């Protein structure tokens, strides 16, 4: 038998059952003796069960036999705990694992590290069993495996905890996504504007509130809310091609600018594309002109929201869901209370084009050019214009201008005139129908002639009805989509204009940087001339004159994007500035200020150049390519519908007049 030092401090050898029962306990402990005497009666009552346990333990190895003996010692002869066997074992397992945690056996750790993955998985899934087995082998073989069991249990616990944390993180992420992005079914649903209610604000003011239905929820918004939404999107996504919204027009002057003040078109029973105006109801008393304006806005605003819900980049932010959330009753209050929207720069040209919410200090200090800076001039071509020629943006700009002109001044304009002409022809046919009916009633004696006149009256009346249906289809399903395409081309033009203004911004920085460098060079020359004698002063003055001319030339070059008036004004301003700045100033202080300004301009120039490259790449390779593909599909659909409507009208009209001819031949 091995020398076993028990937890009471004695080091006697365990030889037989008597030594186990008597000699293991430390001498001189009266309480322990009392406990042993009190436990003798209990041990005698359970003698049969102990003998059965010993017989079963003898079948196993000697190590297992020793462990069983020691378990019986702990269960029967422990003087400190008055508990049953099972509760004592669990308490013993916890205390042993806690006490021996600091004792580490390198060989045991090495074996544990080289163990199979299956054993680790079993340990992680059943930590209680591993602890019990570890304690049994520890009491028998020297106490090394109990550390292994506790370590395995800790590793299994850590693994389970890590899995639990991962599951918790996944659950939190899923909840965050669900709080930001609604159900997938809602994303696939299309927006519909079901009602348009005329609401009075008091003092003779009124506005139209549009009831938007999306999935199972509905919210009411007015036109100014859509306008505010688009302005925020332009700041958040400056490089995206945003769909247009209808122009800001009053209820009085809209009809004059679209189709005349007296036109009233029949609403078609079939809708095309994503907008079906039949589903929209206008509540309240409105005139014909107001009805056209409201239906025009319903179509444009519905298409606006549906296109936003199809944009993957915009869907990454919750702004569209916030707009459609019925809990946000007042949209302006929601925008004003948001810290993200309030921190955005006022000008898009001072935003970070890739992430406007992460605008740096350098972006906020960039100059903001006006539209007058991009006016054409006959002066020298600047560096940014050569960049545009290399990138091909000058050709792209001309092509989109031509495309917008063909749509607006060509297809859309002439089709609107045709619609108005057909609308006038419709009223002429109704007048002819009334005239023939009047003649038929006047021919009382001529029954045959009266019957023919009645047929003609009915024919013109039916033709007027068919033409009225055609005019309604052309107006709502052809002219309105064409007008939307024209405004979409205007959005592409705005995107190209944004890129061009960023180029002008870079040009301003380059010219300002060159001007500051020349001013610094001039001051350095003046500072080097001052301590010298008068013989070199004349040469230095000549150099000064040449150096003075360079900033003026650069200033004239910097104003190459302006007109003649701006050039002269800039020259006068530069002369006044030089007389003020360079009169009785400390050259050293001025040079220090110029050096700081040059460093800031260098940083701004690098940022502006990098932004221009990113914007050019995104617009040219992604935005305009998608724009061309989408416009091609829309125009194909419009032309197919156009030919279908004209074909159906011609077929109905032909059948009508064939029937009139047949009746006349029968007479």
Swiss-Prot record:
It is found in: Endosome membrane; Preautophagosomal structure membrane. PANTHER family: AUTOPHAGY-RELATED PROTEIN 20 (PTHR46979:SF1), SORTING NEXIN-41 (PTHR46979). Residues 38-47, 549-560 have a biased composition (Low complexity). It comes from Vanderwaltozyma polyspora (strain ATCC 22028 / DSM 70294 / BCRC 21397 / CBS 2163 / NBRC 10782 / NRRL Y-8283 / UCD 57-17) (Kluyveromyces polysporus). It comes from the Eukaryota. Required for cytoplasm to vacuole transport (Cvt), pexophagy and mitophagy. Also involved in endoplasmic reticulum-specific autophagic process and is essential for the survival of cells subjected to severe ER stress. Functions in protein retrieval from the endocytic pathway. One of its GO terms (molecular function) is phosphatidylinositol-3-phosphate binding. It holds the Pfam family PX. Residues 76-85 have a biased composition (Acidic residues). Residues 1-94, 524-562 are annotated as: Disordered. The keyword Transport applies. Residues 588-652 form a coiled coil. It is a peripheral membrane protein. The PX domain binds phosphatidylinositol 3-phosphate which is necessary for peripheral membrane localization of ATG20 to the perivacuolar punctate structures. Belongs to the sorting nexin family. Keywords: Autophagy, Coiled coil, Endosome, Lipid-binding, Membrane, Protein transport, Transport. Residues 185-331 form the PX domain. GO terms for biological process: autophagy of mitochondrion; cytoplasm to vacuole targeting by the Cvt pathway; early endosome to Golgi transport; macroautophagy. GO terms for cellular component: cytoplasmic side of endosome membrane; cytosol; phagophore assembly site membrane. This is Autophagy-related protein 20. Its main location: membrane. Residues 55-67, 532-545 have a biased composition (Polar residues). CDD domains: BAR_Atg20p (cd07629), PX_SNX41_42 (cd06867). A 1,2-diacyl-sn-glycero-3-phospho-(1D-myo-inositol-3-phosphate) binds at residues 222, 224, 248, 297.
């Amino acid at each position: 038998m091995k020398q076993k030092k028990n937890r009471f401090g004695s080091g006697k050898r365990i030889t037989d059952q008597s030594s186990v029962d008597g000699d293991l306990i430390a001498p001189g402990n009266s309480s322990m003796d009392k406990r042993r005497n009190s436990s003798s009666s209990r041990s005698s009552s359970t003698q049969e069960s102990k003998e059965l346990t010993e017989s079963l333990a003898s079948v196993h190895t000697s190590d297992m036999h020793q462990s069983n003996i020691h378990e019986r010692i702990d269960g029967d002869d422990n003087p400190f705990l008055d508990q049953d066997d099972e509760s004592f074992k669990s308490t013993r397992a916890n205390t042993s694992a806690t006490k021996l945690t600091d004792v580490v056996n390198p060989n045991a750790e090495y074996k544990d590290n080289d163990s199979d993955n299956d054993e680790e998985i079993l340990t992680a899934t059943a930590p209680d069993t591993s602890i019990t087995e570890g304690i049994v082998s520890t009491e028998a073989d020297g106490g090394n495996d109990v550390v292994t069991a506790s370590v395995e249990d800790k590793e299994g616990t850590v693994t389970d905890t890590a899995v639990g944390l991962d599951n918790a993180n996944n659950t939190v992420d899923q909840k965050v996504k669900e709080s930001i992005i609604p159900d997938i079914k809602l994303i696939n649903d299309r927006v519909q504007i079901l009602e348009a209610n005329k609401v009075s604000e008091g003092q003779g003011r009124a506005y139209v509130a549009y009831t938007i239905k999306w999935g199972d929820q509905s919210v009411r918004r007015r036109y100014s809310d859509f306008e505010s939404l688009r302005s925020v999107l332009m700041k958040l996504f400056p490089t995206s091609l945003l769909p247009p919204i209808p122009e800001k027009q009053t209820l009085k002057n809209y009809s004059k600018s679209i189709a005349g003040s007296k036109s009233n078109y029949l609403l078609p029973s079939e809708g095309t594309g994503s907008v079906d105006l039949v589903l929209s109801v206008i509540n309240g008393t409105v005139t014909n002109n107001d009805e056209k304006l409201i239906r025009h806005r319903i179509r444009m605003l519905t298409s606006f929201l549906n296109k936003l819900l199809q944009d993957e980049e915009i869907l990454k932010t919750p702004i569209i869901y916030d707009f459609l959330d019925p809990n946000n009753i007042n949209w302006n209050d929601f925008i004003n209370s948001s810290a993200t929207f309030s921190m955005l720069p006022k000008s898009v040209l001072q935003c970070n084009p890739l992430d406007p919410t992460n605008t740096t200090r350098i972006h906020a200090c960039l100059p903001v050019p006006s539209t007058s800076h991009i006016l054409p001039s006959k002066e020298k071509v600047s560096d940014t214009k050569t960049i545009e020629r290399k990138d091909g943006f000058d050709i792209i700009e001309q092509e989109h201008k031509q495309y917008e002109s063909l749509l607006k001044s060509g297809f859309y304009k002439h089709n609107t005139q045709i619609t108005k002409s057909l609308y006038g022809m419709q009223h002429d046919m109704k007048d002819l129908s009334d005239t023939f009916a009047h003649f038929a009633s006047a021919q009382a004696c001529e029954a045959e002639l009266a019957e023919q006149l009645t047929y003609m009256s009915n024919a013109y009346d039916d033709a007027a009805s068919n033409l009225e249906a055609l005019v309604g289809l052309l107006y709502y399903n052809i002219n309105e989509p064409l007008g939307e395409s024209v405004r979409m081309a205007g959005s592409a033009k705005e995107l190209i204009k944004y890129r061009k203004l960023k180029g002008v911004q870079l040009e301003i920085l380059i010219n300002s940087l060159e001007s500051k460098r020349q001013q610094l060079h001039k001051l350095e020359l003046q500072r080097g001339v001052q301590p010298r004698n008068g013989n070199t002063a004349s040469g230095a003055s000549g150099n000064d004159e040449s150096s003075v001319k360079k900033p003026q030339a650069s200033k004239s070059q910097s104003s190459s994007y302006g007109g003649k008036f701006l050039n002269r004004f800039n020259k006068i301003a530069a002369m006044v500035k030089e007389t003020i700045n360079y009169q009785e100033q400390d050259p050293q202080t001025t040079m220090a200020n110029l050096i700081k300004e040059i460093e800031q301009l260098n940083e701004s120039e690098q940022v502006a150049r990098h932004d221009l490259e990113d914007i050019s790449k995104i617009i040219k390779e992604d935005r305009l390519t998608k724009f061309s593909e989408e416009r091609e599909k829309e125009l194909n659909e419009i032309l197919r519908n156009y030919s279908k409507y004209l074909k159906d009208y011609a077929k109905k009209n032909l059948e009508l007049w064939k029937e009139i001819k047949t009746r006349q031949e029968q007479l």
